[in-house]
Each structure stands twice: as C-alpha cells, then as structure tokens.
C-alpha cells in the first residue's frame, strides 16, 4: 500500500514570516488581517509570526528571499496589491513579482504563498481583500499551513 502524505491545517509549532507591501496599503492591511486570522485560528500564536512591511510589491521577493535564507521560518506569505493603471508599469511589476516569489520558493525549499493581488481595478482588489471574493490573505495563509505540514511529514 502506498504512503500518502497530506498536509494538516494545524499551525501549532510552525514559524511564519509575512511580507506585506505598503503601496496600496488599504488593500495590503486587509490581506494581512486575513492571513493573521487564518494563522491564529489554526493554532499559531503571535510569537510564531513575524510581519515585515516593505515599500511596495517589487520589494517583496528580495525580502522573502532574505527571510527564507535565514532558517527562521517554516513558511512565508507574500501579500500586496498591484492595480493596473494607464501605463505598462503594472505588467512589469506584476510579472517580476510573481516570478520572484516563485523563484524564492524553488531556490530555498521554503514554502512561499503568493498573496499579491494583480487586478485591473481597485474594486476587484477590494473584493479579494475581504468582501465578495473572500480574503486572499486568508487563503494564502491556509496554503502555507498545509504545505508546511506536508514538508514536515516528508522529512
């Protein structure tokens, strides 16, 4: 019979780092509230969580890489909002941020959740930060709780 590995939604004893961009902070703060809510509901306590605020989304991957390399975290959550404007800036930032966050996870082996909203409008961002479409910060935290437990099981 094969061995099955499944992550549990139990944050007890795990160490979490959260990187949140301050640009569009009215969205980032709602995402952070959602992530903290998920972690605390699933057994984490404040001592297990470090929140690092950075200027904007572009600074998130480098900060996450530094945190992942420290050995102090079982999982990371990256939060922020990039909202389309009238210039191509959105395309460059959203592309590099998503690639950068994926690279951190692959290069370090530390689970990293992508909770950076990339939306066409402010309304879409608001919907995904705790109104109609749920809270993507909460969802990102649930993802890393589960995958951190999968990794723990695989040791």
From Swiss-Prot:
Protein name per the record: 6,7-dimethyl-8-ribityllumazine synthase
Species of provenance: Citrifermentans bemidjiense (strain ATCC BAA-1014 / DSM 16622 / JCM 12645 / Bem) (Geobacter bemidjiensis)
Gene Ontology terms for molecular function: 6,7-dimethyl-8-ribityllumazine synthase activity
Reported function: Catalyzes the formation of 6,7-dimethyl-8-ribityllumazine by condensation of 5-amino-6-(D-ribitylamino)uracil with 3,4-dihydroxy-2-butanone 4-phosphate. This is the penultimate step in the biosynthesis of riboflavin.
Domain of life the protein comes from: Bacteria
Residue positions binding (2S)-2-hydroxy-3-oxobutyl phosphate: 86-87, 128
Pfam families cross-referenced by the UniProt entry: DMRL_synthase (PF00885)
Pathway: Cofactor biosynthesis; riboflavin biosynthesis; riboflavin from 2-hydroxy-3-oxobutyl phosphate and 5-amino-6-(D-ribitylamino)uracil: step 1/2
A cellular component annotation (GO) from this entry: riboflavin synthase complex
GO biological process terms on file: riboflavin biosynthetic process
InterPro entries associated with the record: LS, LS/RS, LS/RS_sf
HAMAP family: Lumazine_synth (MF_00178)
NCBIfam families, sorted: lumazine-synth, PRK00061.1-4
Catalytic class of the enzyme: transferase
Reactions that this protein is recorded to catalyse: (2S)-2-hydroxy-3-oxobutyl phosphate + 5-amino-6-(D-ribitylamino)uracil = 6,7-dimethyl-8-(1-D-ribityl)lumazine + phosphate + 2 H2O + H(+)
Family affiliation: Belongs to the DMRL synthase family.
Keyword DNA repair assigned: no
Active site residues per record: 89 (proton donor)
Residues reported to bind 5-amino-6-(D-ribitylamino)uracil: 23, 57-59, 81-83, 114
CDD domains named among the record's database cross-references: Lumazine_synthase-I
């Amino acid at each position: 019979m094969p061995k099955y590995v499944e992550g549990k939604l139990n944050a007890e004893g795990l160490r979490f780092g959260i990187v949140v961009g301050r640009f569009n902070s009215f969205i980032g703060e709602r995402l952070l509230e959602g992530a903290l809510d998920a972690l605390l509901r699933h057994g984490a306590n404040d001592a297990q969580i470090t929140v690092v605020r950075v200027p904007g989304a572009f600074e998130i991957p480098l900060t996450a890489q530094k945190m992942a390399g420290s050995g102090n975290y079982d999982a990371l959550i990256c939060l922020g909002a990039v909202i389309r404007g009238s210039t191509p800036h959105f395309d460059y930032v959203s592309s590099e941020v998503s690639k950068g966050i994926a690279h951190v996870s692959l290069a370090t082996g530390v689970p990293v959740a992508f909770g950076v909203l990339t939306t066409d409008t402010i309304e879409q961002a608001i919907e995904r930060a705790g109104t109609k479409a749920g809270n993507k910060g909460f969802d990102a935290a649930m993802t890393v709780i589960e995958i951190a437990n999968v990794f723990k099981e695989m040791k």
